[in-house]
């Protein structure tokens, strides 16, 4: 039987505020047994010591555990992305899937988890291959082939002082001893893993470390986010399949730089969300289920020839600058601030740019966004 995906975009008052999800469970909009993934933008710093992410995971486990059983919690991918700089609004994206009759094509969703990653493998080819295997497993679960995939969301681990120390104690050498740098290395390897699984980057082009890989080789349909709250990888694949039904559709674009909105506008236009003035209008916003994007400060320190200071600010990490900057540009286009914009786009789109995915309801389709 075909399957049907649903998405609820819900507000949060704090990282541990699951009241909106709980209300959706009570009123029947959401069946706990159908939930396959929960994404969130939490109001931490998005760096190594952002504990809003594990706090949110703890709250989710406390909500769903009594409903589906502790043993079943592992089948829900909990992808927390810290950082709501600028006007970004903290929010939840709850993704569910169930059997349902009806015509396709429609949004298809699959998720998978990898084994735990050894600290010494982070940022190296072993991590790339591990994530590639996870992406392939999620594609199989969704019934998608590489050409049908529009976006892959990966949550990957980072290195802490304790994890580095444990690796050194057993005679292993991590790729870095810098915990903040480890986030970028992990995101890079995760993105290359997705690109490998999707056929965007050949295996021969990937070095033994991400530093040995040409940055011109990058994923075009992946967003990777690193966090302290896990040791493995959570992988969620989204695409369009004739074997899925329902009102949801997905499309994607790639921004060439931080202000490159034309591809995003074209994507929104293909989904019928733009008004006559070229911006998402009220009717389009009612149909917008989710927007996911990656943001990165360009390595050359400039945007279209004009200098930026995101890389030279000693007070604020460049990922935080980029997240707020790109989110503002996208929010102006769509007229909404509860967008899943994630900083740190290593090997995710071209330098300074990044992939964007838009999920929408077909015109005339009812349902909460």
From Swiss-Prot:
Pfam families: Amido_AtzD_TrzD. Pathway: Xenobiotic degradation; atrazine degradation; biuret from cyanurate: step 1/1. It catalyses: cyanurate + H2O = 1-carboxybiuret + H(+). Responsible for the hydrolysis of cyanuric acid, an intermediate formed during catabolism of s-triazine based compounds in herbicides such as atrazine and polymers such as melamine. Catalyzes the hydrolytic opening of the s-triazine ring of cyanuric acid (2,4,6-trihydroxy-s-triazine) to yield carbon dioxide and carboxybiuret, which spontaneously decarboxylates to biuret. The keyword Hydrolase applies. Homotetramer. Belongs to the cyclic amide hydrolase (CyAH) family. Residues 106-242 are annotated as: RU B. It comes from Methylobacterium sp. (strain 4-46). The record marks 319 as: Important for substrate specificity. Residues 1-100 are annotated as: RU A. This is Cyanuric acid amidohydrolase. Inhibited by barbituric acid. Substrate binds at residues 53, 81-82, 187, 225-226, 323, 342-343. Mg(2+) binds at residues 296, 345, 348-350, 353. The active site is at 155, 225 (nucleophile). Residues 248-369 are annotated as: RU C. Keywords: Hydrolase, Magnesium, Metal-binding. The monomer structure is formed from three repeating units (RUs) that share the same structure as one another. The monomer, the active site and substrate all possess threefold rotational symmetry, to the extent that the active site possesses three potential Ser-Lys catalytic dyads. It is possible that any or all of the three active-site serines may act as nucleophile (albeit only one can do so per catalytic cycle). One of its GO terms (molecular function) is cyanuric acid amidohydrolase activity. Its EC number is 3.5.2.15. Signal peptide: none annotated. GO terms for biological process: atrazine catabolic process.
